[in-house]
Amino acid sequence: MATATNAAAAPPRQLSQKEADIQMMLAADVHLGTKNCDFQMERYIFKRRNDGIYIINLGKTWEKLQLAARVIVAIENPQDIIVQSARPYGQRAVLKFAQYTGAHAIAGRHTPGTFTNQLQTSFSEPRLLILTDPRTDHQPIKEAALGNIPTIAFCDTDSPMRYVDIGIPANNKGKHSIGCLFWLLARMVLQMRGTIRPGLKWDVMVDLFFYREPEEAKQQEEEEAPAVDYAITDFNAGAIAADGQWPGTIDQSWSDAVPQPIPAVPGVNWGAPAEAPAAAGGDWGEAVPPPQQIPVPPSGIDTVQPSGWD
């Protein structure tokens, strides 16, 4: 009887952790915690390094990922699930997760009262809330607790577990770690729904869930932009000879479009003999008579008498 119970509780072989998945989690630093440890996170700690960093047990992380995927699949309408991240490193992963699973994504700052104030236009009553960091997303956690909304969150070693129903122990501060976790969770959800066969590889790369710098994204968009083609497309390409020379028919058809050359201006011969002198009156050495005076008519004003002030 106990054997049958254990077999029923064990996950399917296709969904069990594989070496490639564990290596990917290790490469993304999912197992690295912080130097502080919350008392409710001690059960998920594997050991502590010499520099004080706590190491998270990835076996516990995989079990919690499967539990979270089962809860997500149990909800009939995916739009009743809200995936939210106020941390910049998790915003792209949240959008990609919502794209492939059909959930509703909120990337950025949480508007207070979204889950409690019915007068707001953005008011919603989700059936499940998935968060990236309980410390950064403390406001939606408190509002979800007031509305009896179950909460799933990625919890680091120093994350508070208050009002968190399912805490997935993992590194929630690295951009590669957050993207890897959401990629694994999305793949598990699609496998449990039957969208992806468990034995086959998912064709979506994990790199799509990683955070990208704005400058890097802008540079890639500029490189992928289509270049403008200014080439001539209406010429007769078949008329070009094999040696690359234009035949005479094309020269005749384009003869009207070729502008005529400008006639040359005859040059001046400075060595020619001097011409005949100019006509009379053109000698500059001749004396010029003085100009004639023009008489001024009288104005009719008498001569001003002396005033004695001179």
UniProtKB/Swiss-Prot annotation:
It is found in: Cytoplasm. One of its GO terms (biological process) is cytoplasmic translation. PROSITE patterns: RIBOSOMAL_S2_2 (PS00963). The keyword Ribosomal protein applies. Signal peptide: none annotated. The keyword Nucleotide-binding does not apply. Residues 270-287 have a biased composition (Low complexity). Keywords: Cytoplasm, Ribonucleoprotein, Ribosomal protein. Its main location: cytoplasm. Residues 264-310 are annotated as: Disordered. One of its GO terms (molecular function) is structural constituent of ribosome. GO terms for cellular component: cytosolic small ribosomal subunit. Residues 288-298 have a biased composition (Pro residues). NCBIfam families: uS2_euk_arch (TIGR01012). Required for the assembly and/or stability of the 40S ribosomal subunit. Required for the processing of the 20S rRNA-precursor to mature 18S rRNA in a late step of the maturation of 40S ribosomal subunits. PANTHER family: 40S RIBOSOMAL PROTEIN SA. Belongs to the universal ribosomal protein uS2 family. Component of the small ribosomal subunit. Mature ribosomes consist of a small (40S) and a large (60S) subunit. The 40S subunit contains about 33 different proteins and 1 molecule of RNA (18S). The 60S subunit contains about 49 different proteins and 3 molecules of RNA (25S, 5.8S and 5S). Interacts with ribosomal protein S21. This is Small ribosomal subunit protein uS2. It comes from Glycine max.
